[in-house]
Amino acid sequence: MIGILLLIGICVAVTVAILYSMYNKIKNSQNPNPSPNLNSPPPEPKNTKFVNNLEKDHISSLYNLVKSSV
């Protein structure tokens, strides 16, 4: 009995999550972004700085590893 109720609860939660994501996708597609200000530069992706820093750290650590093994 408890297992059936748990299974029904999980199914309801998954269904609600799917419907909510579909609702947000439809809502966002109906309201496109307003025309951007022509004087401002295009926005960069949010994770660009973080990814660039990770990339630099990764390259420098690989360089140090190769340098120390030689």
Swiss-Prot record:
Per UniProt, the ranges with Pro residues bias are: 33-45
Where does the protein end up?
Answer: Virion membrane
In which domain of life is the source organism classified? Viruses
Give membrane topology per the record: Single-pass membrane protein
Region annotated Disordered, chain positions = 30-50
Among the entry's GO cellular component annotations, what is one?
membrane
Q: What is the effect of changing S61A?
A: No effect on phosphorylation
Copy out the induction comment: Expressed in the late phase of the viral replicative cycle.
In terms of Pfam families, this protein maps to:
Chordopox_A13L (PF05961)
**What UniProt keywords are attached to this protein's entry?**
Late protein, Membrane, Phosphoprotein, Transmembrane, Transmembrane helix, Virion
The answer, when asked if Phosphoprotein is one of the entry's keywords, is yes
Topology feature Virion surface, residues: 22-70
Q: Tell me what happens on changing S40A.
A: Complete loss of phosphorylation
Resulting phenotype, S29A: No effect on phosphorylation
What modifications follow translation? Phosphorylated by a OPG054-independent mechanism.
Transmembrane regions: 1-21
Q: Which residues carry this modification: Phosphoserine?
A: S40
InterPro entries per record: Chordopox_A13L
UniProt family annotation = Belongs to the orthopoxvirus OPG139 family.
Question: What does this protein do, in the record's words?
Answer: Essential for the encapsidation of DNA into immature virions (IV) and the subsequent maturation of IV into mature virions (MV).
**Any idea what this protein is called?**
Virion membrane protein OPG139
Task: Write the gene name.
Answer: OPG139
